[in-house]
Amino acid sequence: MDSVAFEDVAINFTCEEWALLGPSQKSLYRDVMQETIRNLDCIGMIWQNHDIEEDQYKDLRRNLRCHMVERACEIKDNSQCGGPFTQTQDSIVNEKIPGVDPWESSECTDVLMGRSSLNCYVRVDSEHKPCEYQEYGEKPYTHTQCGTAFSYQPCFQIHERPQHGKKLYDCKECASFSSLENLQRHMAAHHGDGPRICKLCGNAFIWPSLFHMLRRTHTEEKPYEYEQCSTAFPAYSSTLRHERTHSGEKPYQCKQCGKAFSCSCYTQLYERTHTGEQSYECKQCGKAFYHLGSFQRHMIVHTGDGPHKCKICGKGFLSPSSVRRHKRTHTGEKPYECKYCGKAFSDCTGFRRHMITHTGDGPHKCKVCGKAFDSPSLCRRHETTHTGEKPYKCECGKAFSDFYYFRNHETTHTGEKPYKCKQCGKAFICCTYLQIHERIHTGERPYKCKQCGKAFRSSNYIRVHEKTHTGEKPYECKQCGKALSHLKSFQRHMIMHTGDGPHKCKICGKSFDSPSSFRRHERIHTGERPYKCKLCGKGFRSSSYIQLHERTHTGEKPYGCQQCGKALSDLSSFRRHMITHTGNGPHKCKICGKGFDYPSSVQRHERTHTGEKPYECKECGKAFSHSSYLRIHERVHTGEKPYKCKECGKPFHCPSAFHKHERTHSMEKPYKCKECGEAFHCISSFHKHEMTH
């Protein structure tokens, strides 16, 4: 077997070359080099068997250190090496490596142990001797020509070089370099046949090891397995980071609040929540982000051009794991199952949050009630329900406890909707709404109910639907005791009590929780009916009303009563019907105790006791207890008969007369006497018959 040359494992970039690399290339470089350093450390005692010169090894360390840090950093009293100390841009130190630390002198190109090294000690690591230290301030090495003094011999030796600081080797195409070796490597990478180009993403690399590392991100090869939990990783450095999740080690602390993290990059991201710094801004919609990963994910919303494509719908994603998660929306796969209640989840985050509801063992606890959460933001959001704090204030005076709701509210003033559907042009305030809307065009319904098989476009819709099977109603109104199955219904209900919806009608002052509800209400005042029935031309204020109306033409009755077999065309009628069997409506009549499903139904019923008839006909003055009775009566004056029999063509002015007539053709007799079994076409005949018993 051929021996491995030093150049096959040691990757050196000059600062000029480093500036030409992309972010993904730099990230891969760090992982490969950290791994290489560790491997070389392991064989450090037997250099003579591997034909690797010690100077090359030290150059390798120095070069890695040169590119392991980010942003310029000014340090006071930095005269030790005769120049300012800088941090090279576009990289982040993910973990500490023995002998690899970020503080570098721009004059001598050597690297010190850290900020503290400048104030206290200088490390000397020569010919593999144990580390020796010198007191800071002592500078035994003085340059005879310029008088500059150094405490560290390598700094002095580099300063003595006549070409120090000069770039003597020019690339005719683009840049200059301080050594012939660096120029040759640059020419191979950018102007020769040297670089290996990845066929999948187009990135180019000189070094085989860096190229192979990139390839693992595409093939998802993970050769480094952590023994304790068998989780595999593409890079050794990732394995070490993962190890901290088991050991609980968090060596990186936030300077402001002391919060600890397992990785320095997480600390840097977290510290931006204190400073408010959002370095990455989207030029298309203006949205700003704390860190690059979130920004890149956001840009895919605009471009749809992620490198990893879904084979089913072609949608692009930033990482293979994101594609896998997305595919589950097509397959319905939910690999994360709760051992306590059997509920399954498609992603790990949702599963972890759910488990906290059983174990109460989240890392972030509410100080008031002790409820646990998996993230500090969720905990803070919850705590505002106790304190009543609403820190996000709009210019209109309305305050919100959550930034997300605040941002959505702001769009009601600005009208800003940056996310636009490519097919119909409809715009939305957030990308989630756009994704759900796009499924209307594609017909995609990835969320299926396990009990009845019904499919839905959104996870919210299926959660609401599943509660119709379980009967779960977790949202209870403290004012009237009414329980509701989902949050939106609860919020709408609360507006009845508070009158504090964000959308207020200028004519009658009534409040609504959403713009769509508000627009529907406005049509009551304007008389606008934009939804027309294709069969009879009748107009309706809402799309849901026209859907119900069309069933009067088609005869569709999807809601069947299991107790008596009666079928109904709409859900509200079905619920009202069920109360006739159970008598268990949440809203009770104060006079007779009868239960109803809606407060409005109770009010209508109570008029049968009080005799109140608030709806009066303008033509003849006749009064009615309900608005629908008035509308039917008005057809007597207008001559309108919208309900036509398909069998004989006879028209009717009200649905009850129409349905009664239809039964003369179908011979259907839905009203059966329990005493003698005789059946009847209509309820009035049935009631008359009952009196004979």
Swiss-Prot record:
Alphabetized GO MF terms: DNA-binding transcription factor activity, RNA polymerase II-specific; RNA polymerase II transcription regulatory region sequence-specific DNA binding; zinc ion binding
Zn finger limits (C2H2-type): 169-190, 196-218, 224-246, 252-274, 280-302, 308-330, 336-358, 364-386, 392-413, 419-441, 447-469, 475-497, 503-525, 531-553, 559-581, 587-609, 615-637, 643-665, 671-693
Keywords: DNA-binding, Metal-binding, Nucleus, Repeat, Transcription, Transcription regulation, Zinc, Zinc-finger
Repeat keyword on record: yes
Protein name per UniProt: Zinc finger protein 441
PANTHER family the record matches: ZINC FINGER PROTEIN, ZINC FINGER PROTEIN 491
GO annotation terms (biological process): regulation of transcription by RNA polymerase II
InterPro entries: KRAB, KRAB_dom_sf, Znf_C2H2_sf, Znf_C2H2_type
Organism in which the protein naturally occurs: Homo sapiens (Human)
Subcellular location, record wording: Nucleus
UniProt keyword Coiled coil, yes or no: no
Residue intervals of the KRAB domain: 4-79
GO terms under cellular component: nucleus
Role noted for this protein: May be involved in transcriptional regulation.
Main location, first listed in the record: nucleus
Any coiled-coil regions, as ranges: none
Family indicated by similarity: Belongs to the krueppel C2H2-type zinc-finger protein family.
Gene name linked to the record: ZNF441
Pfam hit, one: zf-C2H2_6
